[in-house]
């Protein structure tokens, strides 16, 4: 039985491996260049009281750099996972859109967190989506465009017209039922038809991560420490 009902284990494992490999390369590079990079000597001293040794502080700094790499690529991970769902296509990094479903006439731009794009840049995203689904655009005419925030600002679901503030005029962008903003849990349900699809992915990831690290990346017997404590963060983000 597959870990997830909506994509194969091999597709899930491959995407997990891609992300973990990027993180490992970043960590290895950071270790090699740690002393050659400019470290804030003042900040390091103010951080020192929070650690029991310089080695502990150094490991924390390396972990922080690795964490930043992971966070920068998690949005792409979701894009690729959803692109494996039947009927959906991942358009790749730098594509005109992130996800496409021609049969359902849906396009989507996927961001990992509500704070990835903020302020006046949101109006630019609206404008870009508006141009894509406008009658003048032959390929996506009359499609529904979604701006997806996988992690919402608050733990509530939403799927509503996308009306960010226009930085030029100070007014809201016009409401259009075919230009929408949606949280990650709701979008996963829209894509898969499964109300808890995003939580199912989150629950499957510990096994997938342990398998990839142990079987493909040379960390035999790896197990995520204190797994239940990490699992609880899903409820805080999504309610």
UniProtKB/Swiss-Prot annotation:
Gene, per the UniProt record: eco47IIR
Database matches in InterPro entries: Restrct_endonuc_II_Eco47II (IPR019057)
Gene Ontology biological process terms from the UniProt entry: DNA restriction-modification system
Gene Ontology molecular function: any one: type II site-specific deoxyribonuclease activity
Keyword Hydrolase annotated: yes
E.C. number: 3.1.21.4
Protein name (database record): Type II restriction enzyme Eco47II
Ranges that cross the membrane: none
The protein's role, per its UniProt record: A P subtype restriction enzyme that recognizes the double-stranded sequence 5'-GGNCC-3'; the cleavage site is unknown.
Keywords from the UniProt entry: Endonuclease, Hydrolase, Nuclease, Restriction system
Catalysed reactions, semicolon-separated: Endonucleolytic cleavage of DNA to give specific double-stranded fragments with terminal 5'-phosphates
Upper taxonomic lineage: Bacteria, Pseudomonadati, Pseudomonadota, Gammaproteobacteria, Enterobacterales
